[in-house]
């Protein structure tokens, strides 16, 4: 009987309903909410000695911590306790009885107790009156739970928002914080220090106007209330999801996360792409996700710095082409006009005009010379702008209508342009009809030339068609001295056109059926993609059995000649390698999120990175690339194509590919750039460890510093190298969900915020056999178990 009693007492001691003066909370004990959803207790990261007091979702693995008491000061001894003081305050004390954290001074004459509510709110309550004396919902961390609030009070100066963790394993305040603004209507900001990083746009009753999926039909879980006394409160409540949270990540991303019983799914993330980054296009510029180039000037404005815009730096913005001469009621040539732009995220620095309808909004702006633009928005009313139009985006659908004041002469410019355009179109149609007639006759005569028909049926604007004799002359009839390389597609030659342009000519192998598909794919894709970190296609040539693709020539050829070359590797010091790494990621970000086409490359590797005369990287070879439509995030194929070693586990074995499979390939590429070793040929030790296994070993021993190419010792930056090794390992994680997305990847490379710890990559446990290395891979998934995978 005695033994049974001891067991019962031990069980009860691990589970508390409340913390009292007589019943403190020790390490190993927890406090649970009455509904069993939330739990409070001591925890540590990666079994370290640093102990924190926090709240998490009970029973969900891995543990998701939503609030930390002592986020800046962990305790390091096992005798720490969470106690109620004689005055009623909640204290965290260490083994020496030093106060590590407290709720602050609380007055409870008859004592107090602490309990955890069903909504995850830790509350200290008066024992007699039951009044709440202190609550964690008024001291937010990086997470907003349902019914908790962000707020401001202009009278008291109080502000309450979210602050990011330094890293996934360090809850101390990081670089980012979230606030709602006191302006009317309010908007949400993610700040990086004192600099805006992301903006939601103004609030319109149930939605933020800068988030396109929150249209007027959106069923909103959010609530924002502003009163006449200068206070504002933002909160949310999910009726359809028992477990949900809004989280600010250490990289500055706001995520709305919902638990589906198996995993946390993000229903919204901001910033979602580089257009979402605050002010990316500068004053009077706007960002267009679906139409490269990414930034444009509003009608009537031109880039302030053409050279900067050509380099892809748009932050200087745009300047007015014709100055305004505003005199209120003036007419004729002196009058101003308004140009409307649809699907717009309302710019920052707006002013609210109360009790004005749509016509009144227009009239108010028209007769106010300082008014540069206006918008009448359902759920808000009239907004006007008298300062720079900053942080503006144009969505493919949704958004608001913005009316911008222009000089009357801008309309005259438009009319003159329309006249010129009309004449040009007429002439062009005549020329096109002539060529079409000739082309029809030529194709009837040369009916076997089906390739040209295929090309003419594709939407390939701006593509130049070269004659075969032109290319033969440029390449000295494809002489061996001009040959740059050879691959599964065919051979690549250097050439020089009569106008002096240097070109690279990819000559399709006539025996390659796969090459035909690659050829068509590459023409259609690359002609529509324009970015400084993507190779540019100039045109093509199709004549008889010859199929040629003509590119801009890259003076320094491909990256592999520098990374793996015994002599040239010395020319690539660490700073230059790091610049190349960042350039590749920017090109990937454009493919995955910023171009009007969402493209998965599927064959990212060192040899497919070309270098121009300034050693700027250009992603090339889009023959295997796939397009994603709308909200599509992954696809599956029965025909797996790619390069062995660079393919992610889920793609190699099941045919599933996504943004995360390109991230895996980049991780391998990154580790090759750092180490100077090729994944298909590397073998280490008696066991013949593969490259990823060796990288993991280096990471465990020295955090990857000893992985660096020995030729770079004098030029290296150990901390930067170690960080890149860690990022590379995060990219080659077995589960796609454990890999960063492309936007997070760029943030990891360009900030110093702490990173999550990588797990051992699955492919890192394998060793190499004695077979020769394979290069390009092309197999069918349902035949995989019976196939021997060899290179082409």
Curated annotation (Swiss-Prot):
GO molecular function, one term: protein serine/threonine kinase activity
Membrane-traversing stretches: 420-440
Positions in the Cytoplasmic compartment: 441-792
Main localization (coarse): membrane
Positions with a binding annotation for ATP: 484-492, 506
Glycosylation site list: 46, 127, 229, 313, 329, 368
PAN domain location: 326-408
Subcellular locations according to the entry: Cell membrane
Positions of the EGF-like domain: 271-307
CaM-binding, as annotated region: 567-584
GO CC field: plasma membrane
Cystine crosslinks: 275-287, 281-295, 361-382, 365-371
Keywords, comma-separated and alphabetical: ATP-binding, Cell membrane, Disulfide bond, EGF-like domain, Glycoprotein, Kinase, Lectin, Membrane, Nucleotide-binding, Phosphoprotein, Receptor, Serine/threonine-protein kinase, Signal, Transferase, Transmembrane, Transmembrane helix
Recorded family membership: Belongs to the protein kinase superfamily. Ser/Thr protein kinase family.
Protein name per Swiss-Prot or TrEMBL: G-type lectin S-receptor-like serine/threonine-protein kinase At1g61440
């Amino acid at each position: 009987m005695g033994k049974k009693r001891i067991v019962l007492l031990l069980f009860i001691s691990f589970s508390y309903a409340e913390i009292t003066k007589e019943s403190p909370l020790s390490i190993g004990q927890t406090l649970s909410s009455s509904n069993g959803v939330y739990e409070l207790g001591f925890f540590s990261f990666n079994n370290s000695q640093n102990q924190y007091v926090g709240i998490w979702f009970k029973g969900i693995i891995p543990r998701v911590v939503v609030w930390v008491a002592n986020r800046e000061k962990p305790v390091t001894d096992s005798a720490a306790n969470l106690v109620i003081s004689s005055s009623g305050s909640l204290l965290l004390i260490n083994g020496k009885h030093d106060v590590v954290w407290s709720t602050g001074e609380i007055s409870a004459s008859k004592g107090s107790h602490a309990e955890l509510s069903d909504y995850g709110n830790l509350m200290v309550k008066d024992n007699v009156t039951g009044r709440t004396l202190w609550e964690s919902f008024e001291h937010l961390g990086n997470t907003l739970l349902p019914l908790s609030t962000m707020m401001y009070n202009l009278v008291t100066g109080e502000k309450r928002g979210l602050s990011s963790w330094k890293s996934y394993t360090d809850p101390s305040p990081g670089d980012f914080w979230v606030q709602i603004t006191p302006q009317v209507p309010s908007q949400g900001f993610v700040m990086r220090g004192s600099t805006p990083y992301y903006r939601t746009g103004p609030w319109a009753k149930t939605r933020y106007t800068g988030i396109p999926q929150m249209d007027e039909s959106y069923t909103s879980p959010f609530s924002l209330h502003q009163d006449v006394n200068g206070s504002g409160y933002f909160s949310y409540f999910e009726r359809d999801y028992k477990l949900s949270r809004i989280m600010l990540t250490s990289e500055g991303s706001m995520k709305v996360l919902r638990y589906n019983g198996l995993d946390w799914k993000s229903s919204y993330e901001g910033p979602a792409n580089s257009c979402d980054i605050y002010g990316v296009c500068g004053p009077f510029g706007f960002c267009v996700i679906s139409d490269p180039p990414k930034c444009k000037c509003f009608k009537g404005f031109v880039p302030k710095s053409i050279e900067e815009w050509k380099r892809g730096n748009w932050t200087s913005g745009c300047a007015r082409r014709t100055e305004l001469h505003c005199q209120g009621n003036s007419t004729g040539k002196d009058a101003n006009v308004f140009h409307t732009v649809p699907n717009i995220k309302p710019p920052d620095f707006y002013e609210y005009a109360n009790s004005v309808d749509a016509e009144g909004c227009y009239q108010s702006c028209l007769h106010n010379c300082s008014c540069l633009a206006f918008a009448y928005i359902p759920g808000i009313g009239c907004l006007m702008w008298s300062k720079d139009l900053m942080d503006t985006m144009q969505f493919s659908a949704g958004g608001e209508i913005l009316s911008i004041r222009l000089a009357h002469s801008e309309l005259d410019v438009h009319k003159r342009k329309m006249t010129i355009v009309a004449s040009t179109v007429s002439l062009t149609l005549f020329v096109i009809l002539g060529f079409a007639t000739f082309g029809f006759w030529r194709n009837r005569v040369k009916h076997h030339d089906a390739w040209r028909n295929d090309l003419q049926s594709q939407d390939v604007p701006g593509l130049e068609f070269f004659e075969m004799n032109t290319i033969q002359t440029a390449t000295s009839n494809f002489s061996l001295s001009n040959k740059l390389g050879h691959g599964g597609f065919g051979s690549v030659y250097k050439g020089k056109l009569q106008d002096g342009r240097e070109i690279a000519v990819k000559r399709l192998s006539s025996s390659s059926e796969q090459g035909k598909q690659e050829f068509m794919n590459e023409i259609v894709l690359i002609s529509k993609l324009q970015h400084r970190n993507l190779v540019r296609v100039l045109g093509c040539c199709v004549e008889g059995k010859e199929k040629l693709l003509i590119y801009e020539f890259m003076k320094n050829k491909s990256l592999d000649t520098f990374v793996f070359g015994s002599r040239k590797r010395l020319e690539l010091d660490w700073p230059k390698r790091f610049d190349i790494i960042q350039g590749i990621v920017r090109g990937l970000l454009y493919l995955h999120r910023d171009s009007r086409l969402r493209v998965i490359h599927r064959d990212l590797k060192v040899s497919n990175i070309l270098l121009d005369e300034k050693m700027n990287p250009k992603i090339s070879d889009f023959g295997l690339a796939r397009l994603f439509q709308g909200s599509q995030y992954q696809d599956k194929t029965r025909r797996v194509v790619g390069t062995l070693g660079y393919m992610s586990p889920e793609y190699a074995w099941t045919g599933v590919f996504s943004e995360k499979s390109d991230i895996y390939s980049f991780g391998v590429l990154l580790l090759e750039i750092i180490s100077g070793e090729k994944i298909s040929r590397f073998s280490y030790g008696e066991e013949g460890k593969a490259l990823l296994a060796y990288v993991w070993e280096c990471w465990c021993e020295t955090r990857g510093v000893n992985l660096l190419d020995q030729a770079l010792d004098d030029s290296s930056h150990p901390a930067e190298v170690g960080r890149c090794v860690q990022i590379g390992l995060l990219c080659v994680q077995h589960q796609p969900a454990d890999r960063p997305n492309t936007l997070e990847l760029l943030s990891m490379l360009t900030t110093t915020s702490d990173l999550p710890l990588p797990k051992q990559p699955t492919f890192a446990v394998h060793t190499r056999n004695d077979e020769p290395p394979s290069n390009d891979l092309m197999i069918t998934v349902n035949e995989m178990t019976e196939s021997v995978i060899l290179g082409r």
